[in-house]
From Swiss-Prot:
The cytochrome b5 heme-binding domain was proven to bind heme, although it lacks the conserved iron-binding His residues at position 136 and 169. Residues 1-34 form the signal peptide. It comes from Caenorhabditis elegans. The lineage of its organism: Eukaryota, Metazoa, Ecdysozoa, Nematoda, Chromadorea. This is Neuferricin homolog. Its main location: secreted.
Length: 326
């Protein structure tokens, strides 16, 4: 039997198995609704029992990999850190009719006055969004941004008055990069009409030390994202599933969204500064890919000797799957 025929037969068998499971779930739903039993509890219990079956685990992994493959085909890839240009803090207010607004003046452009267009500011940069009144007009989804600099709310989603503020103090790397992405979006989609003299620009339209500090933090966050991207390629995240009794982590050649030639084995990847960990799939044969000094001495253990890795409790060092006990 050739490989293509065998793959087709396996897929058909998996499909029949999953159809049977679906029928069982339907039957259980009927019973549970009739006798007031919690469906979630019953399904979780059955899942724990069936986990002992290698065939059941294979069926679940096949389903997960099929979903991953479909998602990869239809999803739009996110832009990598290096694909977005750094924010230029200089805004030539003397050119092109740009203005320096006070916060009070900017408030007049909140969309409540028919005689004035709708403006908003982010990192002190003022954009004309009047062409999208269906988004920024009174009563619309994004009206809370109109007539003010609410930089922080672009990433926190806090639309209370106390959250509609310009400061970025205390924001995480990802939140700072989200603001950078929003600025890139507005630069591309809307006219830049000036700056607001407040936290990020002075009365002459020149960048303040606060803006310089924020942009330095954004660049640091960008470098952090690049380093994370490299780490993900070396130590891809594990597949995982959880229930009331714990869960399971396992590795495949596509786990973590990183397609590769090896599956690896699950390990705890420890962050040295915080001592937090995540599950990582680690190459367990041939030369390592991490470049760590500890793995260079071996030519056939992959990255297993990396100093930031630990075994999961009660899991075989060679196992492709590890149980997690809650």
């Amino acid at each position: 039997m050739d490989k293509n025929r065998r793959r087709t037969d396996d897929a058909g068998l998996m499909t029949k198995t999953l159809a049977g499971i679906a029928a069982l779930v339907f039957f259980l739903s009927f019973i549970c609704s009739s006798y007031d039993i919690t469906v979630t509890h019953v399904i979780s219990t059955i899942d724990v029992i069936l986990e002992e079956s290698e065939y059941y685990r294979s069926a679940k992994e096949w389903t997960a990999s099929s979903i991953d493959a479909t998602w990869n085909e239809v999803s739009i890839p996110s832009r990598k850190a290096e694909h977005i240009q750094a924010i230029n803090p200089e805004v030539d207010v003397a050119a092109g009719g740009k203005h320096v607004f006070t916060p009070e003046q900017l408030h007049f452009f909140d969309g409540t006055r028919d005689s004035k267009p709708i403006y908003l500011a982010i990192l002190g940069r003022v954009y004309n969004v009047d062409g999208k009144k269906e988004y920024y007009g009174p009563g619309k989804s994004y009206h809370h941004f109109a007539g003010r600099d609410a930089t922080r709310a672009f990433t926190t989603g806090d639309f209370q008055e106390s959250g509609l503020i310009a400061t970025t103090h205390g924001l995480s790397h990802d939140e700072l990069l989200s603001i950078r992405d929003w600025v890139s979006f507005y630069d591309k989609e809307y006219p830049l009409v000036g700056v607001v003299a407040d936290l990020y620009y002075d009365s002459e339209g020149q960048p303040t030390p606060e803006l310089t500090d924020v942009l330095a933090r954004v660049e640091k966050a960008n470098e952090y994202r690049k380093a994370q991207a490299v780490e993900i390629e070396v130590f891809p995240p594990c597949n995982s599933e959880y229930n009331q009794n714990g869960g399971r982590v396992w590795c495949s050649t596509k786990s973590g969204g990183v397609e590769r030639q090896w599956a690896g084995v699950p390990r705890k990847l420890i962050e040295p500064t915080t001592e937090k960990f995540r599950c990582a799939c680690v190459k367990n044969f041939g030369p390592g890919v991490s470049g760590a000094e500890e793995v260079k001495s071996s030519s056939n253990r992959g990255d297993l000797d990396h100093p930031d890795l630990e075994l999961f409790p009660d899991c075989s060092p060679t196992s492709n799957s590890c149980k997690i006990v809650s």
